[in-house]
């Protein structure tokens, strides 16, 4: 997600590993404006720190300190999605879960100003100003 542009990129996948993370970074790379560079904040989940992770040239990874989810703006976004679009539901199968997640993400993108309001931390505002 990009609070400055009030937008984001996501892939809904059924696994979390270095291959999935590399696919996400490749997708994100394609969404970055020409001659721009993205900084991606990440915790140190296993699939974020493997040696075979493919990081495109227009992306830099910044790792947060251990046990500090409050520093990661994406955590507020996930909480919003869970609380407002995915909670109190029963899904018949994996395909239905994937569809619901895609609908939730696309609905979030359609809410003008939502990503900015959830993810614009004061220190991010200072960095992008």
Where are these regions (language model features)?
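Short functional hotspots at interaction and active-site rims
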Residues: 1-129
